Design a protein with these regions (language model features):
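Conserved core of the sugar-phosphate nucleotidyltransferase
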Residues: 113-191
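A general structural signal for well-ordered alpha-helical segments in protein cores
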Residues: 60-63, 90, 154, 177-180, ...
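Short, conserved catalytic or adaptor-binding loops enriched in Gly and charged residues
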Residues: 66-71, 147-149, 206-209
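Short glycine-enriched, charge-decorated loop/helix-capping segments at active-site entrances
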Residues: 19-24, 188-190
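Catalytic core and acceptor-binding pocket of nucleotide-sugar-dependent glycosyltransferases
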Residues: 192-209
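Conserved N-terminal catalytic core of the sugar/cofactor nucleotidyltransferase
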Residues: 2-5, 13-19, 26-27, 31-105
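The conserved acidic donor/metal-binding loop of glycosyltransferases
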Residues: 107-111
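Conserved beta-strand scaffold positions in the cores of enzyme catalytic domains, especially
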Residues: 25, 76, 131-132, 209
């Protein structure tokens, strides 16, 4: 299974709050945020990180060394420019997951309090599902949302638009990585932006349709 973590954004919300270091390196309880994100995710696989190549080369080197210490066999893809959103960032590494292998894309700034083995078992027991998104109940417009059909399957995904009370936590799964790539490329080719960015969740709509 490939596990992709994009982290090439500006981290503008953290900058506004006064943080000077790049978001992945901000410490929480003595550990960098990205280290806690990986540790609490608790899933085994081939880790792929897409990172920003900072003007400060020392920070870039520090982040690379940290990622290799967390997952020694990880793949690191660097970009010197800001992309048009997380989907565009993910596609910078597509040659590493544009295949039939399972793919998970998750955030670099979330700490998971969950049973990762239960999730892995759910994937294994439901191999007929092309994609899985984990939700929680929320009405906050800052989230991604999914609408369910009468059978409990996803029928529509929207970014920053509350179409239900089912918000996504920011962990996305595809049975085949190539399905994400084809959906993402279609979304970008159609210039289907959400809030002027290409987000991950709306790519699922291309599997539904």
């Amino acid at each position: 299974m490939n596990i992709l973590i994009p982290m090439a954004g500006e981290g503008s919300r953290f900058k506004v709050c006064g943080y000077e270091h790049p978001k992945p390196l901000i410490e929480i309880d003595g550990k960098p945020m990205i280290q806690l994100a990986v540790e609490t995710l608790g899933l085994e696989g081939k880790y792929i990180f897409v990172i920003r190549e900072y003007d400060n080369k020392e920070l870039t080197s520090r982040l690379e060394n940290l990622l290799k210490s967390i997952k020694k066999d990880c793949i690191i893809v660097k970009t010197s420019t800001l992309t048009k959103g997380s989907t565009a960032t993910c596609l910078l590494a597509k040659k590493y997951f544009n295949d039939n292998e399972k793919l998970i894309i998750t955030n670099c700034d979330q700490l998971m309090h969950w049973d990762s083995k239960r999730f892995q078992n759910f994937i294994d027991d439901n191999s007929d599902l092309d994609g899985i998104a984990i939700t929680y109940d929320s009405l906050n417009e800052k989230n991604s949302f999914v609408k369910l059909d009468n059978n409990g399957y996803a029928s529509l995904f929207k970014e920053k638009e509350r179409i239900s009370d089912k918000a996504l936590i920011g962990l996305h799964y595809w049975k085949q990585g190539k399905d994400f790539v084809s959906s993402a490329e279609r979304m970008i080719n159609q210039n289907n932006l959400s809030q002027n960015e290409y987000y991950i969740a709306p790519t699922y709509n291309y599997l539904i349709n």
